[in-house]
UniProtKB/Swiss-Prot annotation:
Main location: secreted
Active site (catalytic residues): D93 (nucleophile), H416, D468, E477
Protein's name according to its UniProt entry: Endoglucanase 20
Organism: Oryza sativa subsp. japonica (Rice)
Signal peptide: 1-23
Record's subcellular location: Secreted
Protein family according to the UniProt entry: Belongs to the glycosyl hydrolase 9 (cellulase E) family.
Disulfide bonds: none
Catalytic function, reaction form: Endohydrolysis of (1->4)-beta-D-glucosidic linkages in cellulose, lichenin and cereal beta-D-glucans
PROSITE patterns named in the record: GH9_1, GH9_2
GO biological process entries: cell wall organization; cellulose catabolic process
Length: 516
């Protein structure tokens, strides 16, 4: 290869550490491309965390920064004499779905556990911990007895027929739950994983009583999921599981072993690894890749009985890395991992988080990398590819579009989000009715009056095209689990100093260099 081409490749793949940290601003100011064309990761991280304050349900605290929001859903749970206030609205509607909410908390906890130092350096660890606790508090309340977990608050069908602010909503706050007689092992195990991850992330926060509650509830939920096995598919109206519950049981046991070092959870992982399978996505439904990542971390730490998980995780990497010879998930012409058209960035951000963590673990263990059929990828190459996904989301793409609201100057202005698209209750104090929202606020081409800073939308299509259309929920709607995975991925990019070694296979390097 010519020396000039090598130098160009080094320049393109060396990412800046993020520059000055810029605090998240409510109006979306600041941010953009810094030196060498790298995004300001510190600003993006701050805004990704701020997003969760705009998704809060319940009575808002005095230090609420998304000031366009107000209190909402203050009587949730009353019909069954249980307090189910708080938690997060999952996306652009006003329903609280416990299953993806728990996954959101798990991902936020994982981000804090793996990248707490980088988040702290950005001045955002307190805000991240607050986001974790807001969701974990709800999950604790939802676990009303050893064999009860409330999994949804609100009637999804009725809610989706209205377009109104959460502060105004008058649709039924119907309660859904799993019990010993109507189990949902996926939901119970995911809640267990969430509380275990929250415990690991928050145990040094000074509130020992709260930490003890997290761990006790996590253990209880795992027992509920494991002892009363049944699929959530038969007891859910929305966010039903299609991958079964074995992945969540592995995921929860891996988190509980990380949290407690209790041998019974390691034994569960060891004895059930036959149910671990190679996958090409990581999502609110399919947790295999996450469980494999946690177990592979233990394998590389000396627990060689967990070898199958490491092998499966290597297959996951090979399914994603361009030119691996085993690619299952294609990249768009602009370089974005593209799993499916609807809400694709949820899969991109979760995959990027796993790739980022795995590259770090491989490097710390002294591993040379992952061998695929056509190439071997070093930890640096894996992390470079992961960073390219973060950069794409933040604007290094064919459209020059940041898919994070409020980051840089070109970002989605008409996101599919009820609260963002109707003037704040603090500005328009009268009630906006269900039908008025549909006729007056959903169809307008005007930008949303409330900039939902940090919200990451579903993203572009397979040809890198994006229509900023409020009615297009598949591409314009944000979701908590998109942002939750991005927090860790962005922190990884921020703390990383890329050094491309010239002895690495040139064709592998070229496949990961973005020209945008």
């Amino acid at each position: 290869m010519a020396a000039g081409m090598v130098a160009t490749m080094v320049l393109l793949t060396c990412l800046a550490a993020g520059g000055l940290v810029v605090g998240a601003e409510e109006d979306g100011g600041g941010g953009g491309l810094g030196r060498l064309g790298s995004p300001d990761y510190g600003d993006a991280l701050a805004k990704a965390i701020l997003f969760f304050e705009g998704q809060r349900s319940g009575r808002l605290p005095a230090n609420q920064r998304a000031t366009w929001r107000g209190d909402s859903a203050l009587t949730d749970g009353r019909e069954e004499n249980v307090n189910l206030t708080g938690g997060y609205y999952d996306a652009g509607d006003n329903v609280k779905f416990g299953y993806p909410m728990a996954f959101t908390v798990t991902l936020l906890g994982w981000s804090a556990v793996e990248y707490g130092a980088a988040v702290a350096a950005a001045g955002e660890l307190g805000n991240l911990r607050a986001a974790i606790r807001w969701g974990a508090d709800f999950l604790l309340r939802a676990h009303a007895s050893p064999t009860t977990l409330y999994t949804q608050v609100g009637d999804g069908n009725a809610d989706h027929q209205c377009w109104e602010r959460p502060e105004d909503m008058d649709t039924p706050r119907t309660l859904y739950k799993i019990t010993a007689d109507s189990p949902g092992s996926e939901a119970a195990a995911e809640a267990s994983a969430a509380l275990a991850a929250a415990y690991v992330a928050l145990k040094d926060d000074g509130d020992t009583a709260f930490s003890s509650r997290l761990l006790a509830a996590s253990r209880s939920l795992f027992d509920f999921a494991n002892n009363y096995r049944g699929s959530f598919q038969s007891s859910c109206p929305f966010y039903c599981s299609y991958s079964g519950f074995q992945d969540e049981l592995l995921w929860a046991s891996a988190w509980l072993f990380k949290a407690t070092r209790d041998a019974k959870y390691l034994d569960f992982l060891t004895n059930n690894q036959g149910s671990s399978n190679p996958v090409n996505e990581f999502s609110w439904d399919n947790k295999y890749a996450g469980a494999q990542m946690l177990a592979a971390q233990e394998y590389l730490g000396g627990r060689t009985q967990l070898a199958r998980y490491k092998d499966n995780l290597d297959s996951f990497v090979c399914a994603l890395m361009p030119n691996s010879g085993n690619v299952q998930i294609r990249t768009t012409p602009g370089g974005l991992l593209f799993t499916r058209d609807s809400v694709n960035l949820q899969y991109t951000t979760t995959a990027t988080l796993v790739l980022s963590i795995y590259s770090k673990v491989l490097k710390s263990s002294g591993s040379r990398g992952v061998r695929c059929s056509a190439a071997t990828f070093s930890p640096n190459q894996i992390s470079s590819f992961a960073t390219s996904q973060v950069d794409y989301i933040l604007g290094k793409n064919p459209l020059g579009m940041s898919y994070m609201v409020g980051f840089s100057t070109k970002f989605p202005r008409r996101i599919h989000h009820r609260g963002s698209s109707i003037p704040s209750i603090k500005v328009l104090s009268r009630k906006v009715t269900c039908k008025e929202g549909f006729s007056s606020w959903l169809p307008t081409s005007d930008p949303n009056p409330n900039i939902h800073v940090g919200a990451i939308v579903g993203g572009p299509d397979g040809n890198d095209q994006f229509s900023d259309n409020r009615g297009d929920s598949s591409h314009s709607e944000p979701a908590t689990y998109i942002n939750a995975a991005f927090v860790g991925a962005c922190a990884a990019a921020m703390g990383q100093k890329q050094v491309v070694k010239l002895e690495e296979p040139a064709d592998n390097l070229e496949s990961m260099v973005s020209t945008y």
